[in-house]
Amino acid sequence: MAPLIPGELIPEPGELELNAGRPVTTISVANGGDRPVQVGSHFHFAEANAALQFDRDAARGQRLDIPAGTAIRFEPGDHRDVNLIPFAGHRRVIGFNGRINGPIDA
């Protein structure tokens, strides 16, 4: 057996599918501002920067369907479709821009 290395990651062989089986919502997003906007993987998308133009009701309780720790950058004038997935667990959103601060489904 090989010696253990602190912090080493040993993934299963093959490919791993992120967020497998999670429902996906695709929305169109435009940056109507004059500065770039970056949104992280676990940010409550409905509360993203006001310069981003999209259906915020459709984005309620959802986050970007991208690997953890990454982000998407929207340059001024950018238009693109993004995939969102629902928050799991207790489905509570606390902080961010303070628009919910409680249960998502209330």
Swiss-Prot record:
Q: State which pathway it belongs to.
A: Nitrogen metabolism; urea degradation; CO(2) and NH(3) from urea (urease route): step 1/1
Name of one Pfam family that matches: Urease_beta
Q: Where is the signal peptide?
A: none
Q: Per its UniProt record, what SUPFAM superfamilies does this chain match?
A: Urease, beta-subunit
Q: Which GO terms describe its molecular function?
A: urease activity
Name the reaction it catalyses: urea + 2 H2O + H(+) = hydrogencarbonate + 2 NH4(+)
> Which keywords fit this entry according to its UniProt record?
Cytoplasm, Hydrolase
Looking up InterPro entries in the UniProt record yields: Urease_beta-like, Urease_betasu_sf, Urease_subunit
Source organism superkingdom: Bacteria
Taken from the UniProt entry, a GO cellular component term is: urease complex
Q: According to the UniProt entry, what is the EC number of this protein?
A: 3.5.1.5
Which GO biological-process labels does this protein carry? urea catabolic process
Instruction: Tell me the enzyme class.
Output: hydrolase
| Compartments (UniProt record) | Cytoplasm
Could you say which protein family the record assigns here? Belongs to the urease beta subunit family.
* Subunit relationships: Heterotrimer of UreA (gamma), UreB (beta) and UreC (alpha) subunits. Three heterotrimers associate to form the active enzyme.
Q: Which NCBIfam families match?
A: PRK13203.1, urease_beta
What is the protein name for this chain? Urease subunit beta
The species this protein belongs to is Synechococcus sp. (strain CC9902)
Q: What is the lineage of its organism?
A: Bacteria, Bacillati, Cyanobacteriota, Cyanophyceae, Synechococcales
